C-alpha cells in the first residue's frame, strides 16, 4: 500500500485511476482530485452510521461464507457469467465472492447508495488485489448511486448484444416502503400501487410492498431476454409475490427455485427468508421448487396450477375439485384501532378499559369479543375481552348516542383525541367514533369464526351468550347464520378431511396472515356437500336459489 501511495501521490486523479485500474480492475476509483487527496489522508475508512439508517435501508450485510455458497450454486445452475450486476452491494460480500468464484467475468457493475460503503468496498477490492497480484482483472464499475435512479438498460442491452452470460446477484434491502416512509428515508421508489389495488385494499395496506420486491421485479423485467440468471436473498413472502406477479407478467423465467436459509443464524434476525434463483431467457414458468439451502433436500413445489396459486402442487391435485367459489360470504371482524378505549375486561361485574379505568356505560352496547388467540383456545362462554360497539353499520352517525346512550357517548367523547389520533387513512372523513367490519351480519345469532394468524386452522361455532352475539376482531373471519342446523352443516364441511387437505395445500405457514378472505372465498362447500349427499334448506347462495344441504352422516 505504501508503494501505491507513493506512486499516486504526485499524479492527478485521472492518472491515479489508471494505475489503480491496472492493479485491481476498478474503473474510475476517484471522481475528483479532492477524493484522491482524502484517500491518501484517510486510509482507514469510518463506516459507522446511525441505527436509524440501518432500519431505513433495510441493511443486513451478507456473511462472506453465505455469499460464496450462493455464488457456487449460481455457477452450477447458470454457468460462469461474463457480466455481473449487484444492484445494492453494501459492503460488498457478493462482489468479493463473485470475483473469487466466477472465473470469466469481463465486467462487474456494483451499485450502492451509502457512500461510506462504496469507499470501504473499493479499498477492500484494492487490498485484495495488492495481496494477491494478478495479470488480469475484469473492469469493475462501482457507483455511489440510488437504485431507483440508476439506469440499468445500457448495461443489460450491452450484455444481450454481445451474447454474454449475465448474473444478477445480491441481497436487496429487507424493508417495506411504509417502513421507509415512516423513517422519512430517501431510499424509496416513487409512490406506486404496484398491484393496482383499489378502494379499501389499497387504503388498508395491501399495496404496501417490500423494496426488495420492487427491485427484483424491475431487474427481472429488464433481464428476462438475456442469458444467465438471478440469485437473490429475499424474504419468503417476496418470492411468493414474485410468483404471483409471474402469472400476469409471464416473464421469460425458468428453473425457478427457492432455497430456505436460516436467517437467525446468518443475520441474527427473525425473518423467513431464502435464496431465490431463476434462469433468464426461458419459456415462462409458474412453478417454484423449494429445498433446503444447506442440505439441498427437496421440500415441496408451489406456484400456479391452472388458475390457482397453491403452496403444495402435489397435495392440491387430490382435492382441487373443492377449490372454486364460495356460496357464503366470509367477512373480517371489527376494525377499530382504539383497543385501550373500546376493548374492556370484566371482573366481579365491573368493566375496565385498557387504561385501567372503570367503565360505566349502557350494557346493551357491550358484546363478548373473540380475538385470534381466543379462537384456537376457545372455551364456551369464557371471554377475556368485551367490546363497546358504537355503530351497528359502517357510516352510522354516532351523535345519536348522545340521546339514546348518554353514558356511552360521554365516555367516548372523553377519549375523542384517542379516536382522532388513529393513523389509518380509513378513518379520514368518517364519523369520529367510527369502526369498520360491522353490519347486520355482526348481530346474527350463530357464527363460524376462524383466526387468520395461526398455522393450525380451527373453525369454531359460536352462538348467543346472555342473548348477545359474539363479536370478533379484524384478525378473524366469520360466517353468519340465522339457522343453527345450517351453521352446523357448514362447520362439518369446513372441518372435513377434504377441506382440511385443501387448506393445507393452499396456505403458506410463514405468511403474516395464514388465512385470508380471498382463500376462504374459494372453498366450494356446496360441492363437498353434494359429494356427501347431504341436504338442508339454505337460501345463502350466489344465484339466490334455495338449495338443500344437510349434516354429514
Language-model segment annotations:
Residues 127-156:
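S-adenosyl-L-methionine
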Residues 55-56, 60-69, 88-96, 105-120, ...:
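Signature of N6-adenine DNA methyltransferases within the class I
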Residues 1-123, 128, 146, 151, ...:
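Class I S-adenosyl-L-methionine
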Residues 136-144, 258-265, 504-511:
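A generic structural motif
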Residues 79, 105, 137, 162-164, ...:
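Short, well-ordered loop/turn elements at secondary-structure boundaries
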Residues 69, 73, 97, 101, ...:
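Generic, well-ordered alpha-helical scaffold segments in large soluble proteins
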Amino acid at each position: 500500500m505504501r508503494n501505491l501511495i507513493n506512486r499516486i501521490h504526485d499524479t492527478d486523479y485521472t492518472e491515479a485511476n489508471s494505475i489503480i485500474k491496472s492493479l485491481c480492475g476498478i474503473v474510475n476509483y476517484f471522481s475528483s482530485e479532492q477524493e484522491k487527496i482524502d484517500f491518501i489522508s484517510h486510509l482507514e475508512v469510518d463506516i459507522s452510521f446511525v441505527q436509524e439508517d440501518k432500519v431505513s435501508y433495510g441493511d443486513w450485510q451478507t456473511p462472506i461464507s453465505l455469499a460464496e455458497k450462493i455464488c457456487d450454486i449460481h455457477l452450477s445452475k447458470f454457468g460462469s457469467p461474463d457480466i455481473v450486476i449487484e444492484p445494492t452491494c453494501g459492503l460488498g460480500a457478493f462482489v468479493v465472492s463473485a470475483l473469487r468464484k466466477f472465473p470469466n467475468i469481463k465486467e462487474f457493475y456494483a451499485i450502492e447508495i451509502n457512500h461510506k460503503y462504496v469507499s470501504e468496498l473499493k479499498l477492500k477490492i484494492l487490498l485484495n488485489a495488492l495481496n494477491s497480484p494478478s495479470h488480469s482483472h475484469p473492469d469493475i464499475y462501482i457507483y455511489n448511486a440510488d437504485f431507483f435512479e440508476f439506469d440499468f438498460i445500457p448495461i443489460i442491452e450491452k450484455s444481450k448484444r454481445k451474447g454474454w452470460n449475465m448474473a444478477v446477484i445480491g441481497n436487496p434491502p429487507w424493508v417495506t416502503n411504509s417502513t421507509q416512509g415512516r423513517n422519512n428515508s430517501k431510499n424509496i421508489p416513487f409512490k406506486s400501487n404496484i398491484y393496482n389495488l383499489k378502494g379499501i385494499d389499497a387504503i388498508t395496506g395491501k399495496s404496501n410492498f417490500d423494496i426488495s420486491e420492487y427491485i427484483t421485479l424491475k431487474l427481472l423485467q429488464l433481464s428476462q431476454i438475456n442469458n444467465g440468471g438471478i440469485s437473490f436473498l429475499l424474504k419468503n413472502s417476496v418470492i411468493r409475490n414474485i410468483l404471483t406477479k409471474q402469472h400476469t407478467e409471464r416473464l421469460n423465467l425458468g428453473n425457478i427455485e427457492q432455497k430456505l436459509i436460516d436467517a437467525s443464524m446468518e443475520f441474527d434476525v427473525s425473518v423467513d427468508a431464502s435464496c431465490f434463483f431463476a434462469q433468464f431467457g426461458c419459456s415462462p414458468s409458474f412453478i417454484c421448487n423449494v429445498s433446503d439451502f444447506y442440505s439441498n433436500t427437496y421440500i415441496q413445489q408451489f406456484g400456479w396450477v391452472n388458475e390457482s396459486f397453491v403452496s403444495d402442487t402435489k397435495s392440491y391435485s387430490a382435492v382441487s375439485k373443492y377449490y372454486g367459489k364460495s356460496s357464503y360470504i366470509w367477512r373480517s371482524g371489527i376494525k377499530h384501532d382504539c383497543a385501550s378505549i373500546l376493548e374492556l375486561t370484566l371482573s366481579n361485574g365491573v368493566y375496565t378499559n385498557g387504561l385501567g379505568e372503570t367503565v360505566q356505560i349502557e350494557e346493551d352496547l357491550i358484546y363478548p369479543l373473540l380475538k385470534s388467540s381466543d379462537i384456537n383456545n376457545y372455551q364456551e362462554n369464557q371471554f377475556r375481552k368485551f367490546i363497546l360497539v358504537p355503530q351497528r353499520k359502517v357510516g352510522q352517525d354516532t351523535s345519536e348516542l348522545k340521546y339514546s346512550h348518554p353514558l356511552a357517548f360521554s365516555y367516548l367523547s372523553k377519549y375523542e383525541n384517542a379516536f382522532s389520533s388513529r393513523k389509518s387513512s380509513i378513518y379520514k372523513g368518517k364519523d369520529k367514533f367510527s369502526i369498520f367490519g360491522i353490519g347486520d351480519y355482526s348481530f346474527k345469532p350463530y357464527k363460524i369464526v376462524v383466526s387468520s394468524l395461526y398455522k393450525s386452522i380451527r373453525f369454531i361455532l359460536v352462538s348467543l351468550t346472555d342473548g348477545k352475539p359474539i363479536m370478533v376482531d379484524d384478525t378473524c373471519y366469520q360466517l353468519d347464520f340465522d339457522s343453527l342446523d345450517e351453521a352446523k352443516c357448514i362447520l362439518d364441511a369446513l372441518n372435513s378431511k377434504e377441506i382440511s387437505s385443501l387448506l393445507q395445500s393452499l396456505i403458506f405457514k410463514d405468511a403474516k396472515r395464514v388465512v385470508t378472505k380471498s382463500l376462504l372465498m374459494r372453498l366450494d362447500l356446496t360441492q363437498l356437500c353434494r359429494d356427501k349427499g347431504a341436504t338442508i334448506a339454505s337460501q345463502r347462495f350466489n344465484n339466490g336459489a334455495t338449495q338443500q344441504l344437510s349434516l354429514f352422516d
